[in-house]
Amino acid sequence: MSEKKLETTAQQRKCPEWMNVQNKRCAVEERKACVRKSVFEDDLPFLEFTGSIVYSYDASDCSFLSEDISMSLSDGDVVGFDMEWPPLYNRGKLGKVALIQLCVSESKCYLFHVSSMSVFPQGLKMLLENKAVKKAGVGIEGDQWKLLRDFDIKLKNFVELTDVANKKLKCTETWSLNSLVKHLLGKQLLKDKSIRCSNWSKFPLTEDQKLYAATDAYAGFIIYRNLEILDDTVQRFAINKEEEILLSDMNKQLTSISEEVMDLAKHLPHAFSKLENPRRVSILLKDISENLYSLRRMIIGSTNIETELRPSNNLNLLSFEDSTTGGVQQKQIREHEVLIHVEDETWDPTLDHLAKHDGEDVLGNKVERKEDGFEDGVEDNKLKENMERACLMSLDITEHELQILEQQSQEEYLSDIAYKSTEHLSPNDNENDTSYVIESDEDLEMEMLKHLSPNDNENDTSYVIESDEDLEMEMLKSLENLNSGTVEPTHSKCLKMERNLGLPTKEEEEDDENEANEGEEDDDKDFLWPAPNEEQVTCLKMYFGHSSFKPVQWKVIHSVLEERRDNVAVMATGYGKSLCFQYPPVYVGKIGLVISPLISLMEDQVLQLKMSNIPACFLGSAQSENVLTDIKLGKYRIVYVTPEYCSGNMGLLQQLEADIGITLIAVDEAHCISEWGHDFRDSFRKLGSLKTALPMVPIVALTATASSSIREDIVRCLNLRNPQITCTGFDRPNLYLEVRRKTGNILQDLQPFLVKTSSHWEFEGPTIIYCPSRKMTQQVTGELRKLNLSCGTYHAGMSFSTRKDIHHRFVRDEIQCVIATIAFGMGINKADIRQVIHYGAPKDMESYYQEIGRAGRDGLQSSCHVLWAPADINLNRHLLTEIRNEKFRLYKLKMMAKMEKYLHSSRCRRQIILSHFEDKQVQKASLGIMGTEKCCDNCRSRLDHCYSMDDSEDTSWDFGPQAFKLLSAVDILGEKFGIGLPILFLRGSNSQRLADQYRRHSLFGTGKDQTESWWKAFSRQLITEGFLVEVSRYNKFMKICALTKKGRNWLHKANTESQSLILQANEELCPKKLLLPSSKTVSSGTKEHCYNQVPVELSTEKKSNLEKLYSYKPCDKISSGSNISKKSIMVQSPEKAYSSSQPVISAQEQETQIVLYGKLVEARQKHANKMDVPPAILATNKILVDMAKMRPTTVENVKRIDGVSEGKAAMLAPLLEVIKHFCQTNSVQTDLFSSTKPQEEQKTSLVAKNKICTLSQSMAITYSLFQEKKMPLKSIAESRILPLMTIGMHLSQAVKAGCPLDLERAGLTPEVQKIIADVIRNPPVNSDMSKISLIRMLVPENIDTYLIHMAIEILKHGPDSGLQPSCDVNKRRCFPGSEEICSSSKRSKEEVGINTETSSAERKRRLPVWFAKGSDTSKKLMDKTKRGGLFS
């Protein structure tokens, strides 16, 4: 034992001196006595930053703000710089930089919370590496190495304030930031340990943390400025003080001080009893004693420090605590610098563990307080830092010493592994199913990492993957660790929570579907508020160009003007929500404050308002024009501000309210307030103080996307008081929805949306293509440019000027298509976007709805397409694993599952979207479109193949046996692997990944009847339905598949009962031919059809018609010689397309209107270019359509067009000249308003007036589906999402209108008709057909009510009715909007129960003679209701 002790002692003596903690303490003890703190430090006021703090946690916003900073700074300008990171060491790794602070002026500081961002923002990186901008701070050299290690960012042109101070002050001090603040500013920093040592990586930061961080950066900025203006001749310190300070002056000062002290000593006995604060006096005396001691040492010196009298230390001052904690933080900074420098040279994983233990020892020693109460903790710790840093950075360590350190670290590392390996799974558990490369834009992940729970105190050792190479290396390391058995499972907690994942079940989905099945409601409701008066309508027309308010608009405006009430308005895109906040201040004559996060959109709206003679401005940090003075003078009606500016300038708003008056405060895009929304922004959460500061000003929160939970969150966060909540329908009836699968070939995927011109390809109108990553945007752009297509790329990695140029060119129609990440779109003010294409699966329903909302804002027909692949869903699911807030992550998983169902579904896509937003008026909003070929690809498919929802919608199959096999396989393999291994098990694979023990199981190889891709698709279906769940296991790149509670319960039940599981089938699980209804046969000339892929081979006539419906011809390609019949501009909105009361115009008139429209578009483009404004701001497409119809020639007449204000009317004068010239050249009428019509159109209207079917939109659709498509009533009811009774009543109204109807197929057979007629003729009815209730009571219950109504209408019309017993073969459609010949529908003898031709003939002879006149009526009707084009 003694020998071992000697060896140990010898080994310890060989260790370097700097490793001996005792020696280190002694060295510090010897040097600390010369450092004394100022006696006045405790009385110094605290330095506090009073300007506005811009807190950004989103990578995209951070890039934008950084670029704004760069643009606002000149070369050589300086910003205050500082960084924060968690103080803890975890598993041998130091915490990464969590927060970067930049102070650009005395009034503004930016906090960039990079720990909540998935990747480091490109704009911030460019700013930090910009040599033209100086970054000033203390310890900034260490910060440089920290940034280089954590993010590979080379901080350039940094200024170390310590060096500048020593140079200016001619001294050699070791300064801390606090000591510089004390010396130069006469203040001190508030160093609260609970704040400075808090976890800076947690989201969001507290207000105290924000103020602390901003103050540090501000201190660096203001110190640099003070040092710069400090004259070199001013010397506060000198190396030889005798040369700078006269001896006589020092004598005078010392004598004066001694006299004052003696005088105080004389007065003390009499004044002591009257002292209010004796303790404070004692503290001041102690401070004086300390400084006197220091002064004595400096002047006289001391030969014996040990025995010399020292000041009393019996008081425990709070300042010592501050200084000690300050030392801890500074020490950590130095240690970070050391480790960073070492890693940059040669970094070995074992050094992580060495650094960890060494760091812990040092920290432990640092926290211990010294007994000497007067010691200056800050300076003491600075001395320690310098010593330790010098030691650690020293190259004097011997090779033998280094080997000892490495050996110790390796032994600890291996022992830790040996302990943990007993709890690990076998090294064979190394499956990695998600081995795809992530190349994602910050914008796609903008919400994934920002919703971190404040209570989540777990240490996260993962780091952000910033490149493909990092990802691949991390995955390779993961596999190596698996093979060596050195990885600890971390999935148990996630697995426990995700087993109960509340993904939407089939029952829940059906509840959503049935939400609207409550019967039809009236389109118009009587409102309880008074109509606008004449003065209000005049103001509306003068400034906004409208003759009336929409009902919901007036509801909001009236409550603001008359009741001064808060409002939450959820309005579909294109409804006109901007009028709700623009009109009140214009009418009242005061200021309206509009808060919006979108600078580009605000600039466009300001321009648009100015063109309508409404004074408006944008007020913000990026505003170049000085408008603040004019605002205070009340010269502006509408003022746009950012949420950051608003929250930082409450005093200005209160001043405006007091001096001028604020009519309202509008919060646009209010869904950004909610943490559960798809576009949450923290700056919006601060707007809750608005109501406190301005309690009498009504707040109007507006958005286009907000479910009920988000609406509640908006009310709560804004502190709204008894708000009026108003919702329009979420439906956008002019948008056609379509989903397709990607093929992997970009050009092949996008070609269906392109048209070929003489020289190049082009889209059918302005188009946005959304991509999930920057890399994909560049790939798509490259492919499209091969076709000479004018397009541009837009993403956050581009410079601000480049992005602004792309936006400018797109809104001015200089480029036709923008390929962008989701950073683009919300801020665009372009109403005529015809197509929105998602090249990749959207991440959730809310963001998808917001993005497609960019299309068709002018009310004209537009289309929205999704091109996706299963890998897109995998990528989105993987990104969700980054969310540390478990509750929010599960919520996002549920939202993503809904999106996945949308992509797979064969149901009406419009219905899926509307049911997600809980639209209670889903059927009301969609009566004119849902179930038609203009609704979505699924609805069009049903119409093309004449089958109903019964046959096709969500075709259900029993997948019970397959589900039992797959769930059992996952369970048998212990839920330790991804889905790949259970599939190999079921398919009987010989792969070495599958252990031999599993090959003897009875289920092994039982799934050979299905392909591997089928099983993977089926597993995704089970995940979507909530039977399986994927969770992270070893690290975030590897997933295991586990049973949820729902899946385990089903499996247990299937073991004992029947194995039945009814799921929705899609094209991956069932062959396409099986998805077609068995009762229907597709003709041999029709291409095999897939429900999720629309492009089927159509007849020439139908194809031409669809092109007319959905195509858009650019202005520069239109001429009088164009083939307009095949490709028109665009049809009108669907609300009017199905209204059979619209007059039918002649082909000549339609041709005239279309050619004139093309000339107007050209003239608008030229005029807009001269004015340097976007064409759509000058005049929307809808205004041009109306101008082509009405052909006004005077300014007064153009004002009569809806949407043309007085200001705009004058600007449209050049377009009136175009109309005059065109009409004179072609000899056509002008100024065609309600009192006049084209001569030929008048004649046509007179002929058609008495023969047109006066059916509503909804009734016309039902009639067409029944009479022409030959769909059964039940199928129509399911397709239209309406009750069967409602469908029947639609047909009874068709009978009343005199439209031909196949009565027998409707259910009104002669037998039923006779029963009803007998009831009506006999008592007690006695032929009184007004007694509907009595008739209903007497007619047998099995006869539906709508049949009674039909029979009554037939009896009323008598022989003049145009009804028919069956559809004539040669009859054409009477439903407006189609030219397709109605197919014959001959019923078999079995269907009608007739056995012989004779009996059939006798039956026909018994029918009323007037039944045979249907053919005539139908022909005349069809002639009248032929489809018009854009201008019908």
UniProtKB/Swiss-Prot annotation:
Cross-link named Glycyl lysine isopeptide (Lys-Gly) (interchain with G-Cter in SUMO2), sites: K154, K241, K252
Manner of cofactor binding, per the entry note: Binds 2 magnesium or manganese ions in the exonuclease domain; has high exonuclease activity with both ions in vitro. Unwinding of G-quadruplex DNA requires Mg(2+). Binds a Zn(2+) ion in the helicase domain.
Residue segments, region 2 X 27 AA tandem repeats of H-L-S-P-N-D-N-E-N-D-T-S-Y-V-I-E-S-D-E-D-L-E-M-E-M-L-K: 424-477
Domain 3'-5' exonuclease: 60-228
Ranges spanned by the short sequence motif XLM, renumbered to the chain: 1419-1432
Coiled-coil ranges (or none): none
Compositionally biased intervals (Acidic residues): 507-525
Name of this protein: Bifunctional 3'-5' exonuclease/ATP-dependent helicase WRN
NCBIfam families: recQ_fam (TIGR00614)
Motif (KBM 1): 11-23
Entry GO terms, CC: centrosome; chromosome; chromosome, telomeric region; cytoplasm; nuclear speck; nucleolus; nucleoplasm; nucleus
Motif mapping: KBM 2: 1403-1412
